[in-house]
């Protein structure tokens, strides 16, 4: 993967001196996450690191399209295990046969979704009615690094613009814009992210990252 990055920073420190983890190192850490530089990432995150994703409304599962159905590969919250489990297959969603584009679960918390599924190891079709819930997915360091590698493999090149960064004690608020292309001279895709990085007591490692609710998560609840 090739990458370029542009940094326009309005940085404010409320300390008399910069923390051990310098501004440039924080920038490099963000770039490393998207370039697939797992060595840099591993050097920057602390033992027991957690990445807390932006909250979203949905079914709380990850699924991939395989042979005409969506195979569930991960369940975010144990409470949904009463409905869906890893290995189950979704065949229909709200009366429509699923396809490789996945399913659109836009709606408010509590809105019911009707699914036709087969349970893992069973060929019997069942109809389930599952309400949408608010979920917040957490990743440990191993899962975080694995996801970095998968994501970097998807893109031919990318660019990160850090719009604003605020440092206060052991917290770093950062707002950045990502854009990238999957192919040379291909279409460009964009997203904007706001995150809080929590540093350890020495302020030289990142212990936790929290995604912040955005307008997109709010708008996605509407049909």
Q: What residue ranges belong to the model's regions?
A:
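PDZ-domain C-terminal substructure recognizer with occasional recognition of PDZ-binding tails
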Residues: 103-142
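Hydrophobic/aromatic beta-strand elements that line small-molecule binding cavities or substrate pockets
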Residues: 160-166, 192-199
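Surface-exposed, charged secondary-structure patches
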Residues: 65, 126-185
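Bacterial Sec-dependent N-terminal signal peptides
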Residues: 1-20
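Short, solvent-exposed coil/turn segments at beta-strand boundaries
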Residues: 43-48, 66-67, 167-171, 197-207
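Conserved PDZ fold ligand-binding element
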Residues: 80-100
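PDZ/PDZ-like peptide-tail recognition elements
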Residues: 18-74, 103-106
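Low-complexity, intrinsically disordered terminal/linker segments enriched in charged
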Residues: 138, 146, 150, 208-223
């Amino acid at each position: 993967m090739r990458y370029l990055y542009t940094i326009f920073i309005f940085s404010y420190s409320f300390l008399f001196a910069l923390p051990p983890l310098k501004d440039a190192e924080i920038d490099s850490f963000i770039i490393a996450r998207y370039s697939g530089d797992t060595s840099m990432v591993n050097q920057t995150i602390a033992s027991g690191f957690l990445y807390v994703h932006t909250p979203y409304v949905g079914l709380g599962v990850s699924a991939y399209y395989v042979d005409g159905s969506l195979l569930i590969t991960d369940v975010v919250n144990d409470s949904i295990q009463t409905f869906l489990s890893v290995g189950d297959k979704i065949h229909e969603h709200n009366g429509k046969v699923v396809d490789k584009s996945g399913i659109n679960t836009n709606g408010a918390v509590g809105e019911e979704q009707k699914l036709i599924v087969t349970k893992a190891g069973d060929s019997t079709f069942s109809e389930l009615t599952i309400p949408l819930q608010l979920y917040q997915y957490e990743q440990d360091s191993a899962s975080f690094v694995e996801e970095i590698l998968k994501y970097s493999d998807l893109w031919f090149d990318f660019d990160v613009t850090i719009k604003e960064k605020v440092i206060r004690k052991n917290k770093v608020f950062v707002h950045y814009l990502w854009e990238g292309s999957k192919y040379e001279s291909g279409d460009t895709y964009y997203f904007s992210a706001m995150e809080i990085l929590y540093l350890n007591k020495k302020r030289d490692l990142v212990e936790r990252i929290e995604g912040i609710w955005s307008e997109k998560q709010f708008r996605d609840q509407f049909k």
